[in-house]
């Protein structure tokens, strides 16, 4: 929980503590039937269906290929240990859980003695602890056996074949994984994340580039479990997406060749420096969000839960300095940890859950057939009672028990952002940060609406394609040696004073003070000299974007439907669908399906848009830092002055 109002924070604390340690679940089975799972039927002639909030959520989650593959990788990496089990709940197992079993589990584990509490912020810590004590002191401490040990399997298979659900593609996915160290050894964690970034984060990363040149997959993903871990261990996982069958050995050889290059000291210095700079940014600005305290708490608790020091999660400077000093630390780390890798071939199966669904249907039909008339009526009444509870809402007494704020508890004055006007188009805000965050906004309302989907695709390419001055590889290296990132996006902004809608292309960058001018030079190069004519890069971008969308569409389908519905009556949402909504992906899927026929026209349009997107009219800049940066102010002004007006040819 979090709040910027002290009284509201204490109210939320009371509600949360009460909900966790005195849940209605303990006395009302209908809560279990609603939130967990139930056999639903309202008419005796109907079929019984499984329903429930968590049950339906996990049905959706496990229909995602990516979610399934991740869970399967955990099962193969840590067989018999807790990561191998789906913490959200396998929907085919959720239906086996009974109300009495859940109550027994709750009573054994949900106790203050078995809880971990983190407070963060500028509140009065003594007062907050006293407030907690008022609630927790009502409980007697008790020992709860809760240690979660992990034992790695010996002599487990190194090559595994597993089916995964995919109704739309015949492509395989391949995973190459190995354990890299202990989660409470910060050095192991940071080194693992650094290895992941070095191998595949950048388009010119050794393994990523090798896979792209081989042309055997739509993308290569690499990630570590840095910061959150799997109990006792850190690991690294590389996934070859959407490849043909029979590519397992080719993928394995490619990964191991690059790992052997590292062990032999054959390291790309530019990529090494870029990965190091990116790691530096990632660690220094961790959880730089409005809910920073919650993010920090989750990271600390990930250690604390397994009897590790929570402070361990935030110690990183020493390892970064080792990496900056020379490459030997990195080389020796890879030599030490590259052992016993797992290679998994995930082959697609259509109607993957068909047998389990049919068995579930058969079991429900048999269950109903074995019910007496009285038992069936009781089941129908149980569902009717639940529906009545859901429709009735909370009673006046229940609503009155919710703590509220009085008007006098709220500040009378609206907090003003510390915004300083530099010029008619340039703004600065003071922020206690060693990293400068810059945003440049380019008004594109002069561009025809039918071009918006192509604007959306083009901005995805910017900073990832060559320019007239630099190759794609050199530009990327320069970006990440100079900044934490330079990104482009398209969006629609509403002026709430006059209701006017303005579509913008936004350039966002982050860098340290000493790199401000260099960062602006890179931005200038990208917006003025980018060359979108590389067919290979365009096709790769299209394949990656469509693959990501297809893998996530089931999870985001409700949001897509909501956006489309709102777009029927709201102008802002209608335009947003084109700039970064479903219409953008419809265009990408068409481009993928007919790439050879459409590529020339697409590139021609990109070149046309590059000449008109970045104009002076409506340009706005803003940056936040601990102080004004004179050199940056000057560079922004020079960039604006160099831009052409909309009416320029």
PLM feature spans:
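M16 family metallopeptidases and their MPP-like homologs
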Residues: 1-22, 28-41, 66-92, 114-120, ...
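Short helix/loop capping segments that flank catalytic or ligand/cofactor-binding pockets
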Residues: 9-12, 62-63, 105, 127-129, ...
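Non-catalytic, conformational "gating/processing" segments within enzyme and secreted inhibitor domains
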Residues: 51, 100-135, 563, 573-584, ...
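Generic recognition of flexible, low-complexity loop/linker segments
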Residues: 103-107, 162-164, 222-226, 321-322, ...
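An aromatic/glycine/proline-enriched structural segment found at the starts
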Residues: 116-172, 286, 615, 620-649
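Segments forming glycine/polar-rich beta-alpha architectures that bind adenosine-containing cofactors
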Residues: 312-463, 472, 618, 622-636, ...
């Amino acid at each position: 929980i979090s709040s910027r109002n002290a009284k509201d924070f204490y109210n939320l604390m009371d509600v949360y503590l009460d909900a966790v340690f005195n849940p209605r679940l303990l006395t009302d089975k209908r809560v279990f039937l609603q939130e967990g799972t139930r056999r639903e039927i309202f008419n005796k002639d109907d079929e019984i269906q499984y329903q429930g909030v968590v049950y339906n959520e996990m049905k959706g989650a496990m229909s995602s290929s990516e979610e399934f593959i991740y869970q399967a990788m955990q099962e193969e990496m840590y067989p018999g240990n807790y990561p191998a089990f789906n913490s959200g709940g396998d929907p085919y197992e959720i239906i086996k859980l009974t109300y009495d079993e859940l109550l027994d589990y709750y009573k054994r584990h949900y106790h203050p003695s078995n809880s971990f509490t983190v407070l963060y912020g500028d509140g009065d810590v003594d007062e907050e602890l006293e407030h907690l004590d008022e609630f927790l002191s009502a409980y007697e401490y008790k020992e709860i056996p809760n240690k979660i040990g992990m034992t790695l399997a010996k002599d487990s298979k190194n090559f595994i074949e597993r089916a995964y659900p995919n109704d739309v593609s015949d492509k395989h996915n391949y995973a190459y994984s190995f354990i890299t160290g202990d989660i409470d050894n910060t050095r192991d964690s940071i080194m693992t994340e650094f290895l992941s970034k070095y191998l595949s984060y950048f388009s010119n990363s050794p393994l990523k580039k090798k896979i792209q040149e081989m042309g055997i997959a739509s993308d290569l993903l690499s990630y570590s479990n840095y910061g959150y871990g799997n109990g006792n261990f850190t690991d690294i996982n590389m996934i070859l997406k959407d490849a043909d069958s029979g590519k397992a050995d080719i993928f394995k050889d490619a990964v191991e060749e690059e790992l052997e290059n590292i062990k032999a000291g054959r390291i790309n210095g530019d990529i090494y420096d870029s990965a190091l700079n990116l790691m530096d940014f990632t660690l220094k600005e961790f959880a730089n969000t409005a809910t920073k305290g919650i993010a920090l708490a989750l990271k600390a608790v990930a250690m604390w839960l397994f009897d590790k020091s929570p402070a361990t999660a935030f110690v990183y400077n020493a390892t970064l300095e080792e990496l900056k000093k020379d490459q030997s630390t990195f080389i020796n780390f890879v030599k030490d940890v590259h052992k016993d890798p797992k290679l998994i071939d995930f082959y697609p199966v259509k109607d993957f859950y068909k047998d389990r669904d049919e068995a579930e249907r058969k079991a429900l039909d048999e269950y109903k057939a074995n019910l007496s008339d009285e038992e069936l009526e009781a089941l129908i009444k149980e569902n009717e009672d639940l529906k009545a509870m859901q429709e009735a809402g909370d009673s006046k007494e229940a609503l009155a028990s919710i703590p509220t704020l009085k008007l006098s508890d709220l500040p009378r004055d609206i907090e003003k952002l510390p915004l300083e006007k530099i010029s008619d188009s340039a703004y600065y805000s003071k922020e206690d940060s060693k990293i400068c965050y810059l945003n440049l906004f380019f008004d594109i309302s002069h561009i025809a609406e039918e071009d918006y989907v192509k604007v959306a695709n083009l901005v995805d390419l910017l900073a990832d394609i060559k320019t007239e001055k630099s190759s794609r590889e050199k530009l990327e290296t320069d970006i990440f040696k100079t900044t934490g990132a330079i990104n482009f996006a398209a969006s629609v902004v509403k002026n709430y004073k006059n209701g006017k809608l303005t579509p913008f292309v936004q350039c966002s960058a982050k860098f340290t003070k000493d790199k401000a001018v260099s960062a602006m030079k890179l931005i200038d190069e990208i917006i003025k000299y980018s060359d979108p004519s590389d067919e290979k890069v365009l096709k790769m971008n299209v394949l990656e974007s469509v693959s990501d969308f297809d893998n996530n569409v089931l999870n985001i389908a409700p949001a897509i439907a909501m956006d489309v519905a709102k777009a029927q009556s709201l102008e802002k949402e209608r335009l947003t669908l084109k700039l970064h909504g479903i219409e953008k992906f419809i265009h990408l899927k068409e481009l993928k399906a007919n790439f050879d026929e459409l590529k020339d026209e697409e590139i021609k349009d990109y070149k046309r848009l590059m000449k008109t997107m970045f104009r002076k009219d409506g340009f706005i800049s803003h940056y936040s830092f601990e102080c004004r940066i004179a050199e940056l102010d000057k560079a922004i002004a020079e960039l604006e002055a160099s831009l052409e007006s909309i009416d320029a040819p």
